[in-house]
């Protein structure tokens, strides 16, 4: 996980970019596979960082890095191909309200009576200040132009880095919560940012961070009382109505500081149901194992006889 950690040090070099949700029609009953990934060509004489392309196509930096290993974060090579990972497997949970999957750093919003799902990239809590997992709560209130009162512990952490943090940060362009906040539970919020470098990274104090256009959309459209569920599913899988089997694997979140700072891959959680799925008669075990090793963050067809490349 060290690569993402290092990126945070340089992220303020990036320009600020807006984003828009990727909206998908809900699939028919029994299906969880939506969307389609595609590639784009980096323009000649490119001067833009990877964040520009991520924002343009509604992705976070982690999504782009998983799909494009080896891509230059600061200046993707002109003429190179970038995969935009817009195909995904919906999380294995109720399709209602807001669902946040911290492992893939995406927020899913199911607007009532719309038969669609809107997907937003997010930033989450840094190691040691994790965003809660396996939690169901509701939107308690919303606040335009929020203020921020850092906890004493947060101020101490900043002081250790040689940064002075005031006891109170008023609303405005210097507030790291951005211009809108949706408060969930009593201690956490879904909010904007004063710098888009955190989208797709673990950089917050535990809250959920979105690009500014995205949080404004949610602020305007998500009512108080909406159900919010936070899950941690680095591995998603589905057998579709046509019998095809798909596996989507993300880098799991590190469980402690040592894992976070290590170059080694964090072990994947292999549940009995996942093991049974992989060992099914219609699954190519070799392809499944390759997907578990590659961790591309994109659905891979692992049906026996499938010729999909990844």
Swiss-Prot record:
Top EC class for this record: transferase
GO CC aspect terms: periplasmic space
Subcellular location: Periplasm
Biological processes, Gene Ontology terms: cell wall organization; peptidoglycan-protein cross-linking; regulation of cell shape
Pathway: Cell wall biogenesis; peptidoglycan biosynthesis
GO terms, molecular function: glycosyltransferase activity; peptidoglycan L,D-transpeptidase activity
Main location group: periplasm
Claim: Transit peptide is one of the keywords in the record: no
Active site: 191, 207
Signal peptide annotation: 1-21
Keyword field: Cell shape, Cell wall biogenesis/degradation, Glycosyltransferase, Hydrolase, Peptidoglycan synthesis, Periplasm, Signal, Transferase
All residue ranges annotated as the L,D-TPase catalytic domain in the record: 96-231
Coiled-coil blocks: none
EC number from the UniProt entry: 2.-.-.-
Disruption phenotype: Simultaneous disruption of erfK, ybiS, ycfS and ynhG leads to loss of covalent anchoring of the major outer membrane lipoprotein (Lpp, also known as the Braun lipoprotein) to the peptidoglycan. Complementation with erfK restores some of this anchoring.
Lineage: superkingdom: Bacteria
Sequence similarity: Belongs to the YkuD family.
Subunit structure: Interacts with DsbG.
UniProt xrefs under PANTHER family: L,D-TRANSPEPTIDASE, L,D-TRANSPEPTIDASE ERFK_SRFK-RELATED
Job description of the protein: Responsible, at least in part, for anchoring of the major outer membrane lipoprotein (Lpp, also known as the Braun lipoprotein) to the peptidoglycan via a meso-diaminopimelyl-L-Lys- bond on the terminal residue of Lpp.
Annotated protein name in UniProt: Probable L,D-transpeptidase ErfK/SrfK
